[in-house]
Amino acid sequence: LALLFLSEPSAEHRTQNLLGSLANVGRECWSLLTTIRGALVFFLMLLPIGVGAAQNLWSAVAGDWHASADAVALANGVLSGVVSIVGCLIGGWISDLIDRKTAYCLFGLVLAAATVAMALAPRTEAMFVIFVLLYAFITGFCYAAFAAVVFETIGKGAAGTKSNLLSGISNVPLIYLGIVDGMGHDRWGANGLLYTDAAVGVAGVALFIGVALAANMMRSTAPAGV
């Protein structure tokens, strides 16, 4: 109901006919993906940085920390949701203070460090709850930085479509990292899951830094507006 009292912003891609509007949406998306900046962000969305994939596997390793079913449900359910909201708010604030892609990578590295710390921590139920909540808290930071990067990149034309395009692509690393984390667990146990999650995240940041440096070199020699 609240939306009824808000004025709808102008849609720059919209024309008098549907086909014209769709054509403009296609051009907007194409222009996003064919610029160096847009392609770099598209690539970033494909990387396993700060995706929080281990959250889907906590129940598989809870026994290693002697955590009860109730503790797992509480920590990985309501409490994780609450702390991730707080993380999103703080992470969004920080993302406005520094370069947003830098914030995204930085938060991803912090998440990897927390994952390693969990692997090294004592195997008790209390430690399980603490680190599950810490993981959710930092993942909130990562999701806020993700949103900041997307909103910074999409511009005004066909913003909803471009936002959903990048958001959809960002689900790819969540899927494949969950599979890779599961393989780490099957091969090396709980620590294998945690170290795999952390190592892949760090590798993703390193890969993005390398590609970003190359992109900046290309941008410095490209015509204005690219």
What are these regions (language model features)?
Residues 1-13, 207-212:
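C-terminal membrane-cytosol helix-exit motif in multi-pass small-molecule transporters
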Residues 87-100, 185-186:
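Helix-to-loop junctions at the C-terminal end of transmembrane segments
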Residues 126-142:
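Hydrophobic core of transmembrane alpha-helices in multi-pass small-molecule transporters
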Residues 157-187:
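A late C-terminal transmembrane helix in Major Facilitator Superfamily
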Residues 36-74:
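Extracytoplasmic gate region of multi-pass secondary transporters
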Residues 109-123:
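C-terminal ends and interior cores of transmembrane alpha-helices
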Residues 8-40:
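Juxtamembrane intracellular "pre-TM" segments in multi-pass secondary transporters
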Residues 141-155:
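Intracellular juxtamembrane helix-capping segments at the cytosolic ends
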